[in-house]
């Protein structure tokens, strides 16, 4: 009897101290963050870069891409290095990261249907970047 009470007491203490083990953890959305290093070509302008970037994001990650919850474009605003250009794409789940990326590829081919059109867009757009970038994937912190 004494052993049974001790085990029962230990179980009650364990359960009361660790009540989160029985609750499912809340899962927030997933954020894919890409930090591009900007280039400043002599034959370019902020206006053209903004126009091309907006066009690309709207066509590939906008309303037609059902896996994307939201997207943001962030430009370095203050400090010593103004080369940071950050793209943030929000999706609901880890699986949606791949699905959103695949869909954006399909939408890119719809928006620029020929190889010549794709090359022309890529040449115009890519001149604004050095080719250096980093990719990170974050999950939203949600209270349990």
Segments predicted by a language model, with ranges:
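Residue-level signal for alpha-helical context at structural boundaries
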Residues: 67, 115-118
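Charged, solvent-exposed helices and adjacent loops that form client-binding or oligomerization surfaces
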Residues: 109-115
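Short S/T/G/P-rich N-terminal loop/turn motif that feeds into the first structured element of a domain
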Residues: 20-84, 90-109, 122-144
């Amino acid at each position: 009897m004494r052993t049974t009470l001790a085990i029962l007491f230990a179980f009650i203490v364990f359960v009361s101290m660790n009540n989160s083990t029985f609750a499912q953890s809340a899962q927030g959305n997933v954020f894919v963050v890409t930090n591009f290093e900007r280039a400043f070509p002599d034959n370019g302008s902020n206006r053209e870069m903004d126009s091309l970037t907006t066009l690309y994001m709207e066509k590939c990650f906008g309303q037609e891409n059902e896996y994307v919850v939201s997207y943001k474009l962030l430009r370095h605003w203050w400090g010593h290095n103004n080369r940071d250009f950050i793209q943030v794409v929000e999706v609901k789940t880890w699986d949606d990261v791949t699905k959103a990326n695949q869909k954006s590829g399909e939408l890119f081919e719809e928006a620029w249907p020929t190889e010549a059109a794709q090359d022309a867009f890529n040449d115009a757009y890519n001149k604004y970047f050095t080719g250096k970038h980093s990719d990170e994937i974050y999950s939203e912190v949600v209270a349990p």
